[in-house]
Curated annotation (Swiss-Prot):
It comes from Methanococcus maripaludis (strain C7 / ATCC BAA-1331). Belongs to the transcriptional regulatory CopG/NikR family. Its cofactor is Ni(2+). Coiled coil: none annotated. GO terms for biological process: response to nickel cation. HAMAP family: NikR. This is Putative nickel-responsive regulator. The lineage of its organism: Archaea, Methanobacteriati, Methanobacteriota, Methanomada group, Methanococci.
Length: 141
């Protein structure tokens, strides 16, 4: 049998309710199993992102609560720190509280990963998705 650690987490009520719906829909035996599965998916994604190498082009999509303290200023400052990597940004208002930014990037994969990590860790950021491609002539035929 695998050793298990018991942990406690705090979640917003609506997030837990939505997660519980998915647990029921997918037929998980328990909430713990669903959380373990989610953590496994997160670890796989993390390993994939951190195994990227070489020159890449892509997008970093960010959803954030613009009412959160200084989040827009922090995101802008971080983007200015990576100005050589960022080709363009698109800003969209999703609703009264939330905005989405799509950051077009081109450069070394490790720099793209660093930028993504810094954006992800900001308070008020709800979701970040990195999509990368091999630019130009490096695409396998």
């Amino acid at each position: 049998m695998v050793d298990m650690d018991r942990i406690s987490i705090s979640l917003p009520t609506n997030l837990l309710a939505e997660f519980d719906e998915i647990i029921e829909e997918r037929g998980y035996a328990s909430r713990s199993e669903a959380i373990r599965d989610s953590i496994r998916d997160y670890l796989i994604k993390h390993k994939w992102i951190h195994s990227l190498e070489g020159h890449r082009a892509g997008t970093i999509s960010i959803i954030y609560d613009h009412h959160s303290t200084d989040v827009m200023e922090k995101l802008t400052t971080i983007q200015h720190d990576y100005e050589k990597l960022i080709v363009a940004t698109i800003h969209m208002h999703l609703d009264h509280d939330h905005c989405m930014e799509v950051v077009l990037v081109k450069g070394d994969a490790s720099d793209i990963k660093d930028l993504t990590d810094k954006l992800t860790s900001q308070k008020g950021v709800k979701q970040v998705k990195l999509t990368v491609m091999v630019p130009g002539g490096n695409i396998p035929q």
